[in-house]
Amino acid sequence: MGAKKVLILGAGLVARPMVRYLLERGFEVIVASRTVSRAEALIDGHPAGRAVAFQVEQIEALDPLLAEVDLAVSLLPAHRHVEVARRCLALQRHLVTTSYVSPAMGDLGDQAAAAGLLFLNECGLDPGIDHMSAMQDIDRVKADGGRIAGFTSWCGGLPAAEANDNPWHYKFSWAPRGVLVAATNPAAWLEDG
């Protein structure tokens, strides 16, 4: 069996670490972006990588790319994930995204599970990594017989003091539109419970 193939959709700010990680571990990687030069920069001449042009507005162009891979990772803006998920479902491909699960993505996730596919969402720093690391800590404390009296998690693009040079006091590591949309999402927390 050959190397697993992964399609990365988008060559924005969060793509570089993922592309590098996958290539260093022997995966074949296709980076699809509207700006091929950015995808090429991410591949950086690696023999197991390939950069291709992809315009998300032409979603049918995704099908031949999906036909080549085992897994798609959508790093596109969150409002594009549903279109990608529909294509992955039609072509029986697993999907990973970094965004919250919208009702439409939830419905497609149920269909994917019924088809034996994994649609894994919320795998970004906001919200995924902080959730996973929190659960790891909580599980460890409970396994050692401890009890959680309180837990607070602060996560995001908080810059070092010397780099805190803008009115937002924030450093964009992902699409600014996505940051603004996420900032308007409702929040919930559990306190004293």
Predicted segment positions?
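N-terminal Rossmann-like NAD(P) cofactor-binding module of classical short-chain dehydrogenase/reductase
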Residues: L66, D70-L75, L95-T97
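N-terminal Rossmann-fold NAD(P) dinucleotide-binding loop
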Residues: A15-R16
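Conserved N-terminal Rossmann-fold NAD(P)-binding element of oxidoreductases
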Residues: V6-G10
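ADP-ribose/adenylate-binding Rossmann-like module
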Residues: R87-M105
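Rossmann-like dinucleotide-binding core of oxidoreductases
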Residues: L117-G193
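Rossmann-fold NAD(P)-binding glycine/threonine-rich loop
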Residues: S99-N121
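N-terminal Rossmann-fold cofactor-binding loop
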Residues: A32-V36, Q55-V56
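Conserved Rossmann-fold cofactor-binding substructure of NAD(P)-dependent oxidoreductases
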Residues: Q55-E68
